[in-house]
Amino acid sequence: MAEQLTIALGFRQSFFYRPALSDASQARGAFRAKARVSSRTRQAARASSLIGTEVYHWVRAHFSLPALDVPDLSNETPQMAVQLLRSMWNLGTRPAPNLVQLCESRGISVAGLGLEDLLEETHEPVDAFSLWDDGRPYIFTARRRSPEGERFTLAHELGRLVMHPNDPTTPEAESKADAFAAEFLIPHTACFEYLPYNPSLERLLEFKTAFRVSAIAAARRVHEVGRCSDWHYTELNRILTLRGFRSAEPGGRTFYERSRVFDTIAGNEKYSLHDMATELGLPTELARSFALQTRLSVV
């Protein structure tokens, strides 16, 4: 049977003889998807998270990772939660740095979804999800979006971890996580600090590049905080749409933010991603997917 499963699924036979995977809580998984996800999709994502947590168990057994520094901000509004977190993490109002490495530096485990093909078969694509397991926070991301969109996804999941650590996915929780992400990536004070009222398109594009967000998101945020008029916002959107920013990000970032944890493993002489795949019984490509060794697709 193990040999048949090995052939069918591509896993090494050793995977099927490993001890049962520790069961990450179903209730604590917060899903970011285009629509309400079905039980089948949740099960597929849960299977991915079980393997993902095992990947990090292996990492912790061979490497020293940063200590946990993630506060419980469940009683705060999104704006206040961001202000507190940015202060605790010494970010001020500056553009947020590499979010994968920022999360890793605070003890949050970030990994790819891994079982993308299985999730694709459910016809309910999941962008990302987060959970707490055994006192440790995890973010799993599919990297389906642009690099700028991926930063919003990570900020959204960070918001879920600090504001709703034990709550299931609800429209209200998702809305608050979106508000958290917008404020975390583009603090309202930064809009007043770095931009004039009714900024020109050129200034807006400089701003969005500095803060590593999409032009559409930057325009929306500037309007939300009252830094431009309704008419000016409409005009900015019209021009951005004409220039193709509604469906893509012309001149945007051409690479995803890299993981310091997995890049360290990839360049390590003693332990490698191949060693990780072998010891865990995983297909090499699946291990690379969990390790965020992905590239932008050409479309």
Please name every model-derived segment.
Residues 1-299:
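Active-site hotspot residues in diverse enzymes, especially metal/ion-binding acidic/histidine motifs
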